Amino acid sequence: MIWTDTFANNKQSNIFSTELGENNARLAMLNRQDIRVIVGNPPYSVGQESANDDNQNDHYEELDARLAATYVQETASSNKNKLYDSYIRAYRWASDRIGNQGVIGFVTNAGWLDSSSADGMRKCMTEEFNSIYIYHLKGNARTQGIQRQKEKDNVFGEGSRAPVAIVFLVKNPKSSDYGKIYFHAVGDYLTREEKLAALKWDRSIAYTPMNVIVPDAHGDWFNQRDDSFSHFMRMDGKKTKEVAIFKDYSLGVNTNRDAWVYNSNRQTVINSTKRSVLAFNKALGELNSGLDTSSVRQKYIKDVAWSSSLVSRLERKIPSDFSERRIQKSLYRPFFKQNLYFDPESGFTHRPGRWKYIFPDSKAKNLAICSSGVGSKEYSCLMVDHIPCLDFLEKTQCFPRWLPGEQTKGAEDTLDFGEPSEMPSGFSQEALPHFQAAYPGKPITEDDLFYYIYGILHSEDYRMRYANNLMKELPRIPRVATYEQFMAFVEAGQELARLHVHFEDVAPYAGVKFEYTKVGQPSYRVTQMKWGKIKGKTGNAAKDKTTLIYNDWITVKNIPLEAQEYVVNKKSALDWVVERACVSIDKASGIVNDFNDYAAEMGSERYPLDLFLKIITVSLETMKIVKTLPKLEIHPLDK
């Protein structure tokens, strides 16, 4: 046995060099060997979840330089951090260690096989290896719905959430083939025991039927894209020379301390944020008195949710301040609003994105189309009139109609946004003429274009045809065949926007029946809504989504099942209300988030119940509009 840090390029610590001389002698001997076979189960770790963990990944200068020159350099993704995951480092290290000949056999996280961020890694694999054999064991616990059922158990048990694959990589200098990919996956719905039995039965890749995979030009091995998508105008214009529809866009806001700065109760946001800002400034004083940064952070860990941006501010000894003016409404999850302390300058909003230009403060009037981001497993979009959280949708990216913050750069204290028509447009100069060119002589405004985009993004034809593209890149918008079709999408987009932005103003669904379990004036306070129960297909209890147990007083019946068809961010809109409209306590901070407080701010104790009934209406009306959208026919200019 040899003790070593494999990735450290054989540079041992003082402990190894002074106490384990014999160990180092064996290591030196190993390093002189011509290694041709490497087998292992590398760990999966991309980094700490919070700066409070104080547990950052090690950095390996030489190995990470090789990663940067290969997998990172070849990727088209802007999210390069995931390429420094330990198991991906292991692939890079092993690929170099065997030189120009050998075999690697790894049991690893299977995420790299189809993730958008690993496209460069896959390209390098096909260039460096003659043959690649993949035995996919599924088990991805991060999926939902039917796909989650298909993935079923993980071969490593319930403690692992990542999909697993056995991968063999072969370098053979005598072979004329390069990048041949052979693939086999276990069946759907298999338990852990059934997957292990399948492995035992197959015994070897020599006896296992394999499909040949041919990569596409994007480096995709699975879920390959429709290349006609590239003919359409892209929505995003950053980091590309292509002309785009929007001149600016933003990720949803990433606070890295949601429990502290989001809450149903405005006063709770004030109290918790003040407490944290005061503690941070006290921590600065401790730093000035001689304590090191790590010790200071640990001392104030109960009062400050540390993030890398706030740690950087601490190290630079820059104090923070607090102002109630920075509190505004935010869409935390679909159809679920919260009070947010948004401060892009103080470090207490970890990744503020471009929101100071889109929604500079609570008075700013604007609209933004939110879209699932790159790497999302299922496409969704939703229009908002407030700042959304990063997890509002999956990896939320937002495209604004206007940019009110652009007209007042450097003038925060005198903001006067006026009417939306007076604000700088969010569209590029090329966007409107591009679409007008398809329908000469026909009137099209920027407002038309904005709602047209929203209508197109709801087209079931569009989502199905370009599903693989939408998992791996942000949307592109086609021009439809006729002006009449264009205007049909505009009108649908307007109606959808009215429902989704003004969901609190729609009429509550009137077709339900209320049952009261107690005598007297009912209470509308909510603790945690839950669906009723029925006997499922297998005999076990299943959710009855025609019945809602609102609280101990009220049960709602006759909820139309069709309302469940409207799915946004992998759940029905109603499921989001049931999950989020509750009383919760953050374990780390002890902060209570009571949705009844939000109801009080809205002036109605029954706000949570009315919200549920309104989202029934929103769901039914949305699906009615979506199902009547025109068939997606592409204009000749985009073919």
Give the location of each predicted region.
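SAM-dependent methyltransferase catalytic-core segment centered on the flexible catalytic loop
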Residues: 7-106, 111-115, 124-134, 430, ...
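Conserved residues in the N-terminal Rossmann fold of short-chain dehydrogenase/reductase
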Residues: 2-5
